[in-house]
Amino acid sequence: MTLWVVKLGTSLLRGDTAATIEGYASGLAAAMRRGDQVVLVTSGAVGLGCQKLHLPKRPDTVVALQAAAATGQGYLMALYERAMAVHGLSVAQVLLTRSDLVDRRRYQNASGTLQQLLAWGVLPVINENDALSSAELRFGDNDTLSALVAAAVGAHQLLLLTDVDRLYSSDPRSDANAQPITDVHHPRDLKWLEAGAGDGGRWGTGGMTTKLAAARIATASGVTVHLADGRDPARLAGLLEGDRGGTVFHPHPEPLGNRRSWLAHVLVPEGELCLDQGACQALLHRGASLLLVGVTAVKGQFEANRPVLLRDPDGQELGRGLCTLNSNQVRQALSVVTDAEASPVVVHRDALVLQDR
């Protein structure tokens, strides 16, 4: 049994959306009948809302986007429900915001709900709750959401369906010398691609940059990621059965556990701690906790046990973790504590994730 997370982008749901969804439903149903479990992350609510409201283009204000999403979401779910019912299968709507996942208990509740739906043989259909998401707590795109969902449910495979056939060394639409990339054994090696990966089209928000970011999140959690051409819905059945195509991002050999994945990718840092070189070496090479004596400066205002960014002396991100003290306590103690033996722990190693492992 394979647990799949499948992500459908907005660009794939243009035109005759009902017929397109019926085509994808056949592939999803075939995998579920075979004994696999599938979670679907779908875009399309805003686009369908724009169609229903006869808008000439995607809105450019938050309020208008949220209103379009609210209009289109019910219609989107009705299409999936009808399409899967033909195959005798049920669907469940799950709308998420980042705030649902930032809280550890709610994160576990969301994971448990999805696991129960899968155990019942139901297809969870997930979308960001665009009608309610605030700007500072948005996933921003469903590529990121699909990667976080894959980590939360312990998926084996994440399939990102898009309107290109694979990853290229540069944009093949503008560069005739662009080379296809079929396998990526560590997505961080492709950071240089992100600068030219491109933004989403007129109706979408997820260009290749967000797909590379999603691949890094998922592979860090032990999930194999497939980037494949989804423009022909009939291809989905074969892709879920193991057909090679597109680009495969292989999982990290030492994947993060559930909690560390949550720390690294879900939490939004509320402040920063700047570290000296000795503290950086202790974290990187000795697996130590961060002591206050290794902190040179604190930025931002945050309460105790909230997520913070850790920066090395060059200002580069070293990692993330939960700070045991609030920002004022850290500031007050910086001028007092100079002895490592008397220095309190400000980020315990069990609540710390390094950027490059």
From Swiss-Prot:
Superkingdom of the source species: Bacteria
Pfam family, one: AA_kinase
Residues engaged in binding ATP: 7, 162-163, 205-211
GO cellular component: cytosol
Recorded metabolic or biological pathway in which this protein acts: Amino-acid biosynthesis; L-proline biosynthesis; L-glutamate 5-semialdehyde from L-glutamate: step 1/2
EC number: 2.7.2.11
Keyword Kinase in record: yes
PROSITE patterns on file: GLUTAMATE_5_KINASE (PS00902), PUA (PS50890)
Enzymatic reactions: L-glutamate + ATP = L-glutamyl 5-phosphate + ADP
Compartments where located: Cytoplasm
GO biological process, one term: L-proline biosynthetic process
Alphabetical list of Gene3D superfamilies matching this protein: Acetylglutamate kinase-like, PUA domain
SUPFAM superfamilies listed in its UniProt record: Carbamate kinase-like, PUA domain-like
A molecular-function term among this protein's GO annotations: ATP binding
Keyword terms of this UniProt record: Amino-acid biosynthesis, ATP-binding, Cytoplasm, Kinase, Nucleotide-binding, Proline biosynthesis, Transferase
Keyword Endoplasmic reticulum: no
Residue stretches making up the PUA domain: 270-341
InterPro entries assigned: AceGlu_kinase-like_sf, Asp/Glu/Uridylate_kinase, G5K_ProB, Glu/AcGlu_kinase, Glu_5kinase, Glu_5kinase/COase_Synthase, Glutamate_5-kinase_CS, PUA
Residue positions binding substrate: 43, 130, 142
Role of this protein: Catalyzes the transfer of a phosphate group to glutamate to form L-glutamate 5-phosphate.
Family (UniProt): Belongs to the glutamate 5-kinase family.
Protein name in the entry: Glutamate 5-kinase
